[in-house]
Amino acid sequence: MTRVAILTREYPPEVYGGAGTHVEYLARELRRLTEVSVHCWGAPRDEPGVTNHQAWDALSEPKPEAAALQAMSINLAMAAAVKGVDVVHSHTWYANLGGHLAKLMWSVPHVMTIHSLEPLRPWKSEQLGGGYALSTFCEQTAIEGADAVVAVSKGVREDVLSCYPRVDPDRLHVIHNGIDPDIYKPQPSPETLARFGIDADRPFALFNGRITRQKGLPLLLAAALRLDPRHQLVIVASSPDTPEIAGEVAGLAQRVRDERGNLVWIDRFIPREDLIHLHTHADVFVCPSIYEPFGLVILEAMACETAVVASRVGGIPEIVVQGETGYLVDYNSDDTETFTTELAGRINELLTDNALARKMGKAGRRRVLDHFGWPAIAARTVELYDSLRPAVA
């Protein structure tokens, strides 16, 4: 049985994005097929086979650059801790360097999954300062030396080859993200709506995501000014990347409140159960990202039978079927006015036509059941592990 070490920043209960959710479910399914250990950041976990690693205190300054140096210190600890495994599998730049160092030290294959690419996220320089150059260095070093690179969408595969032309295309494998439809399924809860101050008698559009440039929240707030004022916009968003983006979003949100009202803002992390309830009652889920390698939040919405309006970027067109499970809106950074106008138009259409929204929502869940199950994803991943082992035997 192949012994696999998964290296990741996020792991339950410390999960804040799609990559962490991916690792959670992938590890669960892989354990049914092979031996798995997990190495993650943060506090100790009670789960067997999970080891936490923490940054060196001596690297706490200068800010914000120290964050990247702290990440590298955790990677050193991870690399040292995985001696004796057969395969190392890293996720995101926060753990990729650890996988690369483990490959060099212990002569084991390194598999890395690409959830996003640093060269395509220039706004991260606001958060990391000069540390952004280090995050890109970690990613590039690891991806060019990895034995196999998993792209979570065809769009990501193309992006890898564009950003890092030295990567051998034969080492790139597309294995889509997935979801557990037994967890994410329609679950009505009028009580949850009441608790968050959402009017159950008014249609509403839902956004769920971090306050970052990537997720396009400023664009959604601009589009909100064109939404029918009778309809509600519910936003679940917190953890801003920087004070600058926090201030910008707060100003836009206040303008929406002043000019149209019916904005419900949930500015904290909410349990998965509550989010599923919101998806179930929402008439449309909105994903206005300007960069989205895959879009796991879209799968979550579709699994709950919610129609989707999303940007036509990255891997999203591989999830949303135009006119069947929702609508895709073309994004052009040079013409955001057209984007926000068309985004608002599609949202208004689905908030007004309940029958169409329900039809698209049901089609979305069928698509999730047919194409995005975790057991098949884990099986393909184990096949990839096994294909690499003879090369280093």
Feature-to-residue mapping (PLM):
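Short His-centered aromatic/hydrophobic patch
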Residues: 90-95, 114
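Aromatic "clamp/platform" in nucleotide-sugar-dependent glycosyltransferases that forms part
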Residues: 290
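Carbohydrate-associated surface elements
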Residues: 155, 178
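Nucleotide-activated donor-binding/catalytic signature segment of Leloir-type glycosyltransferases, i.e.
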Residues: 246-269, 273
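Short alpha-helical donor nucleotide-sugar binding micro-motif in glycosyltransferases
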Residues: 277-282
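A conserved mid-protein helix/loop that constitutes part of the nucleotide-sugar donor-binding site
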Residues: 21, 203-226, 247
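Short hydrophobic beta-strand element within catalytic cores of glycosyltransferases
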Residues: 307-310, 320
